[in-house]
A protein has these predicted regions:
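Alpha-helical transmembrane segments used as membrane anchors
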Residues: 1-141
Length: 141
């Protein structure tokens, strides 16, 4: 009985944190930096913490495709809260994480190959660097 109650509370907590991350990612502005002056008005709807989270995950991580992480968090939270079977959700989460990685690296490769603009804004810095590694490793230029 106590374990069921803890899983419900944990599910609600995961949903709340995931919604916070989701709004942080949706309010991401590439022109905002966490190290800007305290006098500058922050436009992220979740404040300075949302700015830091979106900066780390979107700009320094795998880009805009990271919006799927809070979606998976909401699904996991609801599954724990409703005490449903999570066998299929494990497989969906694994495929989702693989999709995030591959899509970000593919976008990075596309921006490196076909664009003259900055190639880390949409795929993220990590996705772009991994794509750049593969371009250098597999090319003969």
């Amino acid at each position: 009985m106590a374990t069921d109650r803890r899983l419900e509370i944990f599910g609600i907590l995961i949903i709340a944190v995931s919604v916070f991350f989701l709004f942080s990612f949706l309010g991401y502005n590439p022109n905002e930096e966490p190290s800007i002056s305290p006098n500058v008005k922050i436009e992220n709807p979740m404040g300075i913490l949302g700015l830091i989270i979106s900066h780390v995950f979107v700009k320094l991580g795998f880009g805009y495709v990271m919006i799927f992480i809070p979606v998976f968090g909401i699904l996991w939270g609801w599954t724990l809260f409703a005490k449903k079977d999570y066998g299929n959700l494990i497989k969906i989460s694994q495929y989702g994480i693989l999709f995030i990685f591959l899509f970000s690296v593919t976008l990075g490769f596309t921006f490196i190959t076909f664009s003259t603009a900055s190639h880390y804004l949409i795929p993220g810095l990590l996705g772009s660097k991994i794509a750049y590694f593969f371009v250098n490793w597999l090319s003969e230029w």
